[in-house]
Amino acid sequence: MKLFVLCIFAMMATLAMSRSWTYVQPKFLNKAFEVALKEEIIVRWDRKLAKWLRVNGGPLSHVQKKALYFVNRRYMQTHWANYMLWINKKTDALGRTPVVGDYRRLGAEIGRRIDMVFFYKFLSGRNMIPKYMPYMEQINRMRAADIPVKYMGK
């Protein structure tokens, strides 16, 4: 139930960001570009979570804190196609061939713009942090670059 509610909120945030249901036409994405995006997004969100945990994480158990790190990774996986929609617009607007630095900058902007602190407050305030499961541990142990997403490059 907790994970279901989390998914509903993730869907609402996606709709608020995209303002429409749009099919993202698959487009070749270089593996280096994908890695740069993932690393920057996760680094920004993990920083926000670490800062939030320092201030508000006292009542949370160690397992609940690990579950919140999983929330970061699952949120990125869930919304990857929408991020690519936005990234395609931004890279097309460059007027040149994008480089890894452009994707790092865009990943950092996604990580900065999306207010994950709202989700941490919501989940912890309503005691809705998902129960920590073995599959969560597997994803948490992965490097940001290795987290599987749909719409991957070749």
Curated annotation (Swiss-Prot):
Tissue: Sperm.
Species the sequence originates in: Haliotis kamtschatkana (Pinto abalone)
Name the record gives this protein: Egg-lysin
Highest taxon listed in the record's lineage: Eukaryota
Function field: Dissolves the egg vitelline layer nonenzymatically during fertilization. It creates a hole of about 3 mu-m in diameter through which the sperm pass.
GO biological process, one term: single fertilization
Oligomeric form and interacting partners: Homodimer.
Keywords: Fertilization, Signal
InterPro entries on file: Egg_lysin, Egg_lysin_sf
Pfam families: Egg_lysin
